[in-house]
């Protein structure tokens, strides 16, 4: 189930302030955030937001198709190295 329309989308207050400040200054520098649960809004289009994946910040360039999704969807937290070929070989 999605979030109630009455409540509106969740977005961290600090992230909103940073995006609005950059929009008013016409600044396009990278914004660092730890808020993976924040919803992408139309005002973020064209910005690069570095989303924390648990280890590093992954830069995500926001496009129109991403609006409505969460920031965490675009910064994978797990790495897949493949299954071992055989017991003797290793990786």
UniProtKB/Swiss-Prot annotation:
Q: Which GO terms label this protein's molecular function in UniProt?
A: rRNA binding; structural constituent of ribosome
Keyword list (alphabetical) reads: Ribonucleoprotein, Ribosomal protein, RNA-binding, rRNA-binding
GO-annotated cellular components = cytoplasm; small ribosomal subunit
Biological process per Gene Ontology, one example term? ribosomal small subunit assembly
Statement: the UniProt record of this protein carries the keyword Phosphoprotein: no
Which InterPro entries does the UniProt record give?
Answer: Ribosomal_uS19, Ribosomal_uS19_bac-type, Ribosomal_uS19_CS, Ribosomal_uS19_SF
Q: Does the keyword RNA-binding apply?
A: yes
Q: Which Pfam families match?
A: Ribosomal_S19 (PF00203)
User: Superkingdom, according to UniProt?
Assistant: Bacteria
* SUPFAM superfamilies named among the record's database cross-references: Ribosomal protein S19
**Xref: NCBIfam families:** rpsS_bact
UniProt lists the family membership as follows:
Belongs to the universal ribosomal protein uS19 family.
Q: What function does the entry list?
A: Protein S19 forms a complex with S13 that binds strongly to the 16S ribosomal RNA.
Know the name of this protein? Answer: Small ribosomal subunit protein uS19
What is the species of this protein?
Prochlorococcus marinus (strain SARG / CCMP1375 / SS120)
Q: What is the lineage of its organism?
A: Bacteria, Bacillati, Cyanobacteriota, Cyanophyceae, Synechococcales
Q: Which gene encodes it?
A: rpsS
């Amino acid at each position: 189930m999605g979030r109630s329309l009455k409540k509106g989308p969740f977005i961290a207050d600090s992230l909103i302030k940073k995006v609005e400040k950059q929009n008013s200054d016409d600044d396009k520098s990278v914004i660092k955030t730890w808020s993976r649960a924040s919803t992408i809004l139309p005002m973020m289009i064209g910005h690069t937001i570095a989303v924390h994946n648990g280890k590093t910040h992954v830069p995500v360039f926001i496009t129109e198709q991403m609006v409505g999704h969460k920031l965490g969807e675009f910064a994978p937290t797990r790495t897949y190295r493949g299954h071992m070929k055989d017991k003797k070989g290793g990786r």
